[in-house]
Amino acid sequence: MKKDIHPDYHPVVFKDAGTGHSFLTKSTATSDRTVEWEDGNEYPLIVVDVTAESHPFWTGAQRVMDTAGRVEKFNQRFGAMARRKKKNA
């Protein structure tokens, strides 16, 4: 491999802003903020809005979108315009 062309890949702590859950992984992301981890070492800290701890899909709080209702609502709003354009064409 060529030297000095690869990004710095190092341990980083990611913290979920909503739940406070933190986990240590490797990343190329960097931060000026640091945190002392359970092993006694200090790592860069990156605070994120959503992780697997808070995302609705992974927590089981996922809701199903009513796409049929959304299509009907769209047609109610803009369907008349499309019908008028077809008549004029």
From Swiss-Prot:
The keyword Ribonucleoprotein applies. GO terms for biological process: translation. Coiled coil: none annotated. Pfam families: Ribosomal_L31. HAMAP family: Ribosomal_bL31_2. Part of the 50S ribosomal subunit. This is Large ribosomal subunit protein bL31B. The gene is rpmE2.
